[in-house]
Amino acid sequence: VAEEIAQHTLDETELGDYNGKFLKISTKTRAALMDIIDDKSVGIIEEDVERNIVKIAKPVGVIGALSPSTNPEATPVIKAINAVKGRNAIVVAPHPRAKLTNKMIIDNMRAALEKMGAPADLVQDVGIVSLEKTNELMKQCDLILATGGAAMVGAAYSSGTPALGVGAGNAVITVDETADIVDAAEKIRISKTLDLAASCSADNSVIA
């Protein structure tokens, strides 16, 4: 499946490269899952007995996820993992340039949910992709997760719905005197060139 999605994404968006997209689908999404798989995400998640403070997590409801053309193979998956982990439903509105890729990914996630005995409708897409549909999703959902250009993230923040946004990336890497310079340089190179730096999380600046 990862091979098919990687090639389909490249063909549709004409952004990045096959190897980068394959790695993001097969490793980055899995790593995101493993980071939180054992974390408690609903109910009492933290308790300070001495101060009599209890932190309780609960679902927010339906999450509206806006997905970019630069990382459509991984962003919807990672957002869906986090949404479902918190017992939320999620509806993904893709960039028009990646609508078919998004449909393929959503269909795969829905099939996986059904296979596990969970409701497939926990993960959905908006259907026909349009600006009007995306704007309506932002009005109707309980929380927006917006990843994309500055204008789109700005629209999410101005929608009247609580929103978390990520716009243009500027990932800064700090290399101090304790670092293995050769190892650091190689890791920065890999990050900057992965998927031809299509993702906003690619290393962009170095402080040494």
Model-identified regions with their sequence ranges:
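A structured beta-alpha segment of the ubiquitous adenosine-cofactor-binding alpha/beta core
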Residues: 42-55, 123-141
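General beta-strand structural signal in soluble alpha/beta enzymes
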Residues: 92, 124-127, 145-148, 163-166, ...
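Buried, small/hydrophobic-residue-enriched core segments of structured protein domains
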Residues: 57, 143-152, 163, 179
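ALDH superfamily catalytic-core signature
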Residues: 78, 85-86, 153-208
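Conserved small-residue-rich beta-alpha loop and adjacent elements
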Residues: 35-111, 116, 159-161, 170
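N-terminal Rossmann-like NAD(P)+-binding subdomain of aldehyde/semialdehyde dehydrogenases
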Residues: 1-53
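Conserved acidic residues
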Residues: 61, 142, 204
